[in-house]
Amino acid sequence: GLFPSLGSTTAGSLLSGLWLQDVLMLAVLACFLAARKTSWRMIGVRAPQGRHPYLGAVIGGILLYVLMTLLVQLINALLPNGLSAQNVQSYMQADDALWVKIFVVLTMGVFVPIAEELIFRGYLFNSLCRYLTPQMAMLFTAVIFGCAHMDAQRAIPLAVGGYLLNVIAVRYQSVFASAIAHGLWNAVMIVAYYSVL
């Protein structure tokens, strides 16, 4: 694997898979941008603009966590057998070494959100804006984001979260703002999950 020091643990497999997937997605994105002669800045890779953008991104991340928790609890209550564990949760349960937990939080709270924001709120959203109104592009991007996680039970909450991340990216004219919110959402979720294990 990419992280031989993790051994053959399921956490190591998860992290290797996530890093490989995201590195490949970013490589494909870089090729698309080069082929279209589009700069990274054109897809939102720039400092957040507007009033208090970093504070807004942090507040957005906290609100995302609260809203997603409520939506997941609602869905959990409506399903006869409740929600099944996410793959990430299953992997996190398999290895309880502190350094693995820290690495999972960093991976899910930093690397994955940056990659996903560049793909969804950066490239996809801006590409759809060529053919759709910004509101429709936000909606389509959110639905694709929800479906891309390959979790039918959580697709709606993830789409809602994706829409709110679009709002943050558009509001602050930067995928860095939405990456901060996304990273905080993921990190708080993982830390909260670890705290109840």
Give the location of each predicted region:
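Juxtamembrane helix-loop-helix connectors linking adjacent transmembrane helices
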Residues: G1-L18, K37-V112, R130
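Functionally important transmembrane alpha-helices
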Residues: Q135-L197
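Selective recognition of hydrophobic, aromatic-rich stretches within alpha-helical transmembrane segments
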Residues: G12-C31
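Transmembrane alpha-helix boundary and packing residues in multipass membrane permease domains
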Residues: A30, Q73, G122, N126, ...
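Hydrophobic core segments of transmembrane alpha-helices in multi-pass, intramembrane catalytic enzymes
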Residues: Q21-M25, V104-M108, L158-L165
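Structural signal for the C-terminal ends of transmembrane alpha-helices
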Residues: C31-W40, I168-Y172
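Active-site His/Glu-centered metal-binding helix of metallohydrolases
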Residues: I114-I119, Y123-L124, D151, L184, ...
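Membrane-interface helix/loop boundary segments of multi-pass membrane proteins
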Residues: R51, A115-F140, V170-S174
